From Swiss-Prot:
PANTHER family tied to this protein: KELCH-LIKE PROTEIN 22, LD33804P
Basic and acidic residues bias spans: 131-140
Gene responsible for this protein: Klhl29
Kelch repeat locations: 585-635, 637-683, 684-730, 732-778, 779-821, 822-870
Pfam families named in the record: BACK, BTB, Kelch_1, Kelch_KLHDC2_KLHL20_DRC7
Protein name per the record: Kelch-like protein 29
Entry keyword Nucleus: no
Length: 875
């Protein structure tokens, strides 16, 4: 049972069941209620002094006692009536503040009325054991203002009027009228006991305040229609300030207020006197404001800042009216014979072109300063200028598809930058397959880069739809070639590009046939299907009549017929378009696989496309049992160097041609090696250290892929193998590795290619071996090694080393790459006995965490891993 329910059961249940109540709030075995009239008073007697029903809240001492007339009181009936009748003349004879508490007591409740929680008061339950009359003691709210009133409830059908006299405020205040909400009083009973009396509501409404000040504030509360409860008003203490909306307190059934009692108003600030039309606080907008919302903000003692947000709009409106009336204008613009009179300052504030033009004209003009400046403009339509001026003076303008291009051209020419952005935003939403090329040409002519890039990307993305429009047949030759030769042209079949070229030529063959070879070179003929090439392209009359066109077709035929010779046919026409399936992929090259306690070599080469999370097989390695090699990507090709096969250390260099999907032996290193590192710097491949025929080698050489030549550079200060190497900040770094004694080499070696010099530092923090290193966001990450999950991070700028987040698995002989701002660690082996790992995990620098990814085709270690752009055929 709740706290107030238990108190009810303890103190009030017996008396309630007996219905023995007295008019003054006490109860006993028997009760008699009598009222004796007196001169403005009444007397109530009782046979028992035992506490009874709780009275209504006591009016604080600051509120005088209302003068009451005799009222009948009946007992033994559920229709109890309490009435306080006050004449309008009695307000003048009320007592002043300071009367005794005995004179300021409430008449209480009549028979059969009890305190309790009603639905009206569910938001303010009792929080103490004190009854409401004690909770509302005068000492509890010493500063309560005269808004607290005493309310009596009854069901008398006649009009019940309550009038109270309030002391004269220190300064003049208009009359305040308060309309109280519905008041309900019901007993608080357990759920199984129904209420003994119906809800007794009291409904009050107030008339409008008088227009003249009163000598004292009088609150008149005649009974009105049901549920009329407008927001009460409170009087502001600021002199000269009208009524201010204030949420007044509302008494409810248990003596609590529906809203908190407001503190006394602050003392008057003489310096803050404002007209009644100006709000006194940062409240809601007033209907009296000329410009809508006005704000008054306190910025110090006696200081206020007034802000009118509608002021700029009103000023522009007035300036526009002056422009239309040609009042106070000082600039005349003549366009196509029409004269436009404007204000120089207004126009110069919106247009850099006119600002500079006006400044130069004023400096060069010999006219009197009182004469209007006159500008004559050509290459501009008068209607367009009128629309621009309308925007300058109002900040608004209607744009449609008919005038958008013209307005953008004029706004761009006269440097109305704000209006240019509006036009660009509008045209971006209006782009279609039928107008995107025209918008692209217009944006390029106006040097509007934002619109140009938007239109270009849009046109490239929907090429099949654009190719079906008439607009593409009307663009210039240069624009057409630039469009169809773009690598980002989104087409599933190169045959469509060829057909579009032929249509463009045949639109005006007399003029355009001479460009047939130049146009045909923009088509990727090697990617056209051989049957289409032989049956359609070869039989086209435009092709037959041009020797240059026939050469291009023959090149495509050789590409299909001689796949082994494709390496010598590297031209822009043999490069696939990006939309044709080219993606940046992670390639796994060879490696070792655990089969029980034995190992076997892998020749498979696979790639993973992160866009669709799929694995694709590539051309296998041309050798079988090779390990400890090194791979690196240069461009879109993969170079594999060195390694060991059947106990023999090798110097071979093989190249995987991404476009041709095959492996070729391209060169040999000057020093055979395995367990070495290779990387690319400035387009050249560097091979570092490793294990040679006679042990560790310190030899370093670089390979030029264009000239196919090797060149030796400065050797390593410390000969190591199985180290971690990467490029960062223009330097080549080699971390740790295995020294000649077969132990971890705690050394960091760095090489500067520009000066061909090495430097090194020894540190116990560097103890990695059989671990890869990658560069991300200016930091070097060393992953795993020695069967560990650790991640070591090196900062080249500060020269310090710190530990990073651990990987999910211990990885030795793993490989790592960087793709799309993430680090990918692939494969590896957990321990010398295995098992090999068949998964990847990615490092996200924003969250500094590692995440496991789907499994690879098979568990692998001692493999190569690189990133290239690869053409993935659909399906």
């Amino acid at each position: 049972m709740s706290r107030h329910h238990s108190r009810f059961e303890r103190d009030y249940r017996i008396g309630w069941d007996r219905r023995e109540w007295s008019v003054n709030g006490t109860h006993g075995a028997t009760s008699v209620c009598s009222v004796t009239s007196g001169a403005g008073g009444s007397t109530a007697s009782s046979l028992s002094a035992r506490p009874g029903l709780l009275p209504l809240p006591v009016v604080p001492s600051r509120l005088p006692t209302p003068a009451t007339a005799p009222a009948p009181c009946t007992t033994g009936s559920s229709e109890a009536i309490t009435s306080l009748v006050v004449s309008s003349a009695s307000a003048a004879t009320t007592k002043a503040p300071g009367i005794s508490k005995a004179d300021n007591q409430s008449q209480g409740l009549t028979t059969s009325i009890r305190w309790g929680q009603t639905p009206v008061n569910q938001s303010t339950p009792w929080d103490t054991d004190e009854p409401p009359s004690k909770q509302m003691r005068e000492s509890d709210n010493p500063g309560t203002g005269p808004w607290v009133t005493t309310v009596a409830a009854g069901n008398q059908p006649s009009l019940i009027t309550h009038s109270y006299g309030v002391t004269q405020p220190p300064t003049f205040s208009p009359a305040v009228n308060v309309q109280a909400p519905v008041i309900g009083v019901t007993p608080s009973l357990p759920p199984h006991v129904g209420p003994q009396l119906p809800l007794i509501p009291g409904h009050y409404s107030l008339p409008q305040p008088p227009s003249q000040p009163l000598s004292s504030v009088v609150v008149n509360m005649p009974a009105q229609a049901l549920y009329a409860s407008p927001q009460p008003l409170a009087v502001s203490t600021l002199p000269g300030v009208g009524q201010v909306s204030r949420p007044g307190p509302t008494p409810v059934g248990n003596g609590h207020m529906a809203g908190p009692l407001l503190p006394p108003p602050p003392p008057a600030q003489p310096s803050a006197a404002l007209p009644s039309s100006v709000p006194a606080t940062n409240g809601p907008p007033t209907t009296d404001s000329a410009h809508g919302l006005q704000m008054l903000r306190t910025i110090g003692v006696g200081k206020y800042e007034f802000t009118d947000p509608g002021h700029p709009k009103e000023m522009l409106k007035e300036l526009n009216q002056q422009r239309r009336a040609k009042a106070f204008t000082d600039l005349k613009i003549v366009v196509e014979g029409r004269e436009f009179e404007v204000h120089q300052n207004v126009l110069a504030s919106c247009s850099l072109y006119f600002k500079d033009l006006i400044q130069r004209s004023v400096q060069d003009s010999s006219q009197s300063s009182r004469e209007k400046l006159e500008l004559v403009l050509s290459n501009l339509q008068a209607d367009v200028l009128e629309l621009l001026l309308e925007f300058v003076y109002t900040g608004s303008l209607v744009i449609d598809s008919a005038n958008a291009k013209t307005l953008l051209e004029a706004a761009s020419k006269f440097q109305f930058h704000t209006f240019c952005k509006v036009c660009v935003s509008f045209l971006e939403k209006q782009l279609t397959a039928s107008n995107c090329l025209g918008v692209l040409a217009m944006a390029e002519a106006m040097q509007c880069s934002e619109l140009y890039h938007m239109a270009k990307a849009f046109a490239l993305q929907i090429f099949p739809e654009v190719a079906a429009q008439e607009e593409i047949l009307s663009i210039s030759k240069d624009d057409f070639i630039a469009y169809v030769s773009n690598d980002s042209l989104n087409t599933k079949a190169e045959e469509l590009v060829y057909e579009t070229v032929i249509k463009w030529i045949k639109k005006d063959p007399a003029t355009r046939a001479q460009y047939a070879a130049e146009l045909l070179a923009a088509v990727r003929l090697p990617f056209i299907h051989p049957s289409y090439l032989l049956n359609v392209v070869d039989n086209e009359e435009l092709i037959k009549s041009s020797e240059a066109c026939r050469d291009l077709v023959n090149e495509a035929k050789r590409y299909h017929m001689l796949p082994h010779a494709r390496q010598e046919m590297q031209t822009p026409r043999t490069r696939p378009r990006l939309s044709a399936g080219v993606a940046e992929v992670i390639v796994l090259v060879g490696g070792r696989q655990m089969v029980g306690m034995t190992q076997r070599s892998l020749v498979a080469v696979t790639c993973w496309n992160p866009q669709n999370n799929k694995w694709y097989p590539l051309a296998s390695l041309p050798f079988y049992d090779r390990e400890f090699f090194s791979v690196v990507s240069a461009g879109d090709n993969i170079y594999l160097s060195g390694g060991m096969e059947s106990g023999v250390t090798l110097a071979d260099v093989w190249c995987y041609m991404s476009l041709l999907d095959n492996w070729n032996l391209v060169s040999r290193m000057t020093v055979p090696r395995c367990r070495h590192n290779s990387l690319v710097y400035d387009g050249k491949i560097y091979t570092l250290g490793g294990l040679g025929v006679a042990g560790n080698v310190d030899h370093v050489e670089r390979y030029d892929t264009i000239t196919n030549q090797w060149e030796a550079v400065a050797p390593l200060p410390k000969a190591v193998h199985s180290a971690a190497a990467t490029v960062c900040g223009g330097k080549i770094y080699v971390f740790g590795g295995v020294n000649e004694a077969g132990r971890a080499a705690g050394v960091l070696q760095s090489y500067v290619p520009q000066t061909n010099t090495w430097s090194f530092i020894e540190s116990p923090m560097i103890d990695n071996k059989y671990a890869p290193a990658v560069t991300l966001n200016g930091f070097v990450f060393i992953l795993g090694g020695a069967y560990a999950r650790a991640t070591t991070i090196y900062d080249p700028e500060k020269g310090n080393i710190k530990a990073g987040p651990n990987m999910n698995h211990s990885r030795q002989f793993c490989s790592a790459v960087v793709l799309d701002g993430k680090i990918y660690a692939t494969g590896g082996i957990v321990s010398s006995e295995g098992p090999a790992l068949g998964n990847m995990e990615a490092y996200e620098p924003t969250t500094n965490t590692w995440t496991l990814l789907p499994h690879m085709p098979c568990p692998v270690f001692r493999h190569g891993c690189v990133v290239i752009k690869k053409y993935i055929q659909s399906g």
